[in-house]
Amino acid sequence: MADLISVVGTVILMMIVDFKKMAVEFKRFFGLDSTQNFPALSIVENKLCQTDTNFEFNVIADVDWNCKDSVQAYYRHCASLHEICIKESVYEKARSGDRSALYSIAHEISHWGLINYFKLNLGVKEFEQLDPVSKVVLMNIHENIADLLTSLLVFSEEELLKAKSAGDFDFSSCMGKDQISLALFYCQNHQILAENFINKIVPQLMAQNRQTELKRRIG
């Protein structure tokens, strides 16, 4: 049930939020134009520290890695600490240009951006007070949209669609199957999703609100 709700929640966000514009704006925030590559390692080592006084970037020795939820890197958000941690072996791969390692770092930067820059925190402040199912749902949705934002930062929409049709790039070298599917689904459908939200869902919500207000007044 939690997985199904997470999928629905992710699609609703795709209808409401223009993630393509979000990726362009996030690049601009780091002084990049929309066509430039996303230098994840440089950003996490230098620019985030300059931008966020609460930010820390830590490389952890493989033998000391104890995060059960991630095998490569993670983002931790507290009131006075915004921390990206990465396993040492993954960090060394990123320094050598490994696409999978760089994608992992970009993914954690996306988490930072969603919470701190775009303020799309999805209840992070009240997270510990949530019931177990709600926690799973919010975590899944946040992972999904971080994956989507990362894909649009690292690759252009044109690259994703071209590679899908021509098969000229192996996205599996840096992305999982679910991440690829999510990015392609958004690139192929984001305009339709947005139009449906504006033309169908918004009028329904407004009609519902009017009906609720009418009942309240009559009552």
Where are these regions (language model features)?
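Active-site hotspot residues in diverse enzymes, especially metal/ion-binding acidic/histidine motifs
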Residues: 1-219
